[in-house]
């Protein structure tokens, strides 16, 4: 399912950056600045009311001086064109301006876009009277928020994203039926909360089996996204991969706009190459901006199983590479570092490049690094070994007994610290998901466990499970059953997963 894109549009100083920070902070998401595309474009990943989406701050637009279309930068236009939802921010305190009218005239021409007028800075004023004049813009209802305080933000995002989710569910009736299940009427939420005991060996065994069955049912086709800055050789690498030992290759336009999904087979394994550069016939490439779209890249990362981050050996690791890397890790995707254009460099320069990689990428020492020449093909074939290794590690089977045993060994070697005269106690661990591997650790005083000890546990699990090429996530829960007595509203994804697990557990208990 394609991740929805939300673009924030408006004149300067209406609170777009404040809303952007409010949205992305909900998941502590990386805010990626990509210099050189247009001035201060910002892209981030966010989650509101159970919906994952990409949010874009298009920067301030002044529609009064040279006309909206001329004043907008190319990337701002592209963001609006590729967005699923456009949030048009206006300042409730300042009132309607000629710049607002100019922007509204442009947006009104894009009738195929979901456009919502959002009146910001409504705190401390009579919001209804101040917002009345914005109805003249002719863009429908005016939503009221106070981005600096977060008031109305969650309700706004849930309102604008719900129609997109319904449209996607309509294309998948089975998923829609699951998401529309009334949890309170079926009573299954209570059964999951109160009857399932994580401390009970029989129940944890059933959970292990349910997760294993779900893992087994997953599509074994590995989706590979090739991402990187402009002119690092992404298209050359794609063509080189497709030209090497291929069996079935054809161009299939994907649901992610303008990205091309290319199925292929190699040594009996099915892959899908996601080319963010847009592999198409030469005659159809008209705009230089198609060479690199941040939006397409971020969506490809979300949709992939393994990401090949391509770096130009002659230019080294840039801040933009690190921004992309941060987004990959935040999305939990498996990673292979590809250093391209390795041919023709003398040994001194190669040593300098390797030294810089070690220095700037020391925080991702779990990822394999390959030095290749996409143009000449040297080293390209070896990429598939690392791709398969990373995917296998990200989807490997884990059991409660295995994870608890590793936890006990880790605490025996290095005990948790004392807090308030009491030692923090880690009781047991169980699998919480895969791709990336998620390990849920239960114990007492989890909120007081230092970050340094969490890193120690993460590294210990990585070494013990031999996880290469994939991030690993640890979740810390207080007590035996953190779900007992709680009736949290589940997200659509959680509803689908809970439905599958409960169905399996009920069948196993008969």
UniProtKB/Swiss-Prot annotation:
Associates with the 50S ribosomal subunit. It comes from Pasteurella multocida (strain Pm70). InterPro entries: AAA+_ATPase, G_ENGA, GTP-bd, GTPase_Der, KH_dom-like, KH_dom-like_a/b, P-loop_NTPase, Small_GTP-bd. The lineage of its organism: Bacteria, Pseudomonadati, Pseudomonadota, Gammaproteobacteria, Pasteurellales. Belongs to the TRAFAC class TrmE-Era-EngA-EngB-Septin-like GTPase superfamily. EngA (Der) GTPase family. GTP 1 binds at residues 10-17, 57-61, 120-123. Residues 396-480 form the KH-like domain. This is GTPase Der. Coiled coil: none annotated.
């Amino acid at each position: 399912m394609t991740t929805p894109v939300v673009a924030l549009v408006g004149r300067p100083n209406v609170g777009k950056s404040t809303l952007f920070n409010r949205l992305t902070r909900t998941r502590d998401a990386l805010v990626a600045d990509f210099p050189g595309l247009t001035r201060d474009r910002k892209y981030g990943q966010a989650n509101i009311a159970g919906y994952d989406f990409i949010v874009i701050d298009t920067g301030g637009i002044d529609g009064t001086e040279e006309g909206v279309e001329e004043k907008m930068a190319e990337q701002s236009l592209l963001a609006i064109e590729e967005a699923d939802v456009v949030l048009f921010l206006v300042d409730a305190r300042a009132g309607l301006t000629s710049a607002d009218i100019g922007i509204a005239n442009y947006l009104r021409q894009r009738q195929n876009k979901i456009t919502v007028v959002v009146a910001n800075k409504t705190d401390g004023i009579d919001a209804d009277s101040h917002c009345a004049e914005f109805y003249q813009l002719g863009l429908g209802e005016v939503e009221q928020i106070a981005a600096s305080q977060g008031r109305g933000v969650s309700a706004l995002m849930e309102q604008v994203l719900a129609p997109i989710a319904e449209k996607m569910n309509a294309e998948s009736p089975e998923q829609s039926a699951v998401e529309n299940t009334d949890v309170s009427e079926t009573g299954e939420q209570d059964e999951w909360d109160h009857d399932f005991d994580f401390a009970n060996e029989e129940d944890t065994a059933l959970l292990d089996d349910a997760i294993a069955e779900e893992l087994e049912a997953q599509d074994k086709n590995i989706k590979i996204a090739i991402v990187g800055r402009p002119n690092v050789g992404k298209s050359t690498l794609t063509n080189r991969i497709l030209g090497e030992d291929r069996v079935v290759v054809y161009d299939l336009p994907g649901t992610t706009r303008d990205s091309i999904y290319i199925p292929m087979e190699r040594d009996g394994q099915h892959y899908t190459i996601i080319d963010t550069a847009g592999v198409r016939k030469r005659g159809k490439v008209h705009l230089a901006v198609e060479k690199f779209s941040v939006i397409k890249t971020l969506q490809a990362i979300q949709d992939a199983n393994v990401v090949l981050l391509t770096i130009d050996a002659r230019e080294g690791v840039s801040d933009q590479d690190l921004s992309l890397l941060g987004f990959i890790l935040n999305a939990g995707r498996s990673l292979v570092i590809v250093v391209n254009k390795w041919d023709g460099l003398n040994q001194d320069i190669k040593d300098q490049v390797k030294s810089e990689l070690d220095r700037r990428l020391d925080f991702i020492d779990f990822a394999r690094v390959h030095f290749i020449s996409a143009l000449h093909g040297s080293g390209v074939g070896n990429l598939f070994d690392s791709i398969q290794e990373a995917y296998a590690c990200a989807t490997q089977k884990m059991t409660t007994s295995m994870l608890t045993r590793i936890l006990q060994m880790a605490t025996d070697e290095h005990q948790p610290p004392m807090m308030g005269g009491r030692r923090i106690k880690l009781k047991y661990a169980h699998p919480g998901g895969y791709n990336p591997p998620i390990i849920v650790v239960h114990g007492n005083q989890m909120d007081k466990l230092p970050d340094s000890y969490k890193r120690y546990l993460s590294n210990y699990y990585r070494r013990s499970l031999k996880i290469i090429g994939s991030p690993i996530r640890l979740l810390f829960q207080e007590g035996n059953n953190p779900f007992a007595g709680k009736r949290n509203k589940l997200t659509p994804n959680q509803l689908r997963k809970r439905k599958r697990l409960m169905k399996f557990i009920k069948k196993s208990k008969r």
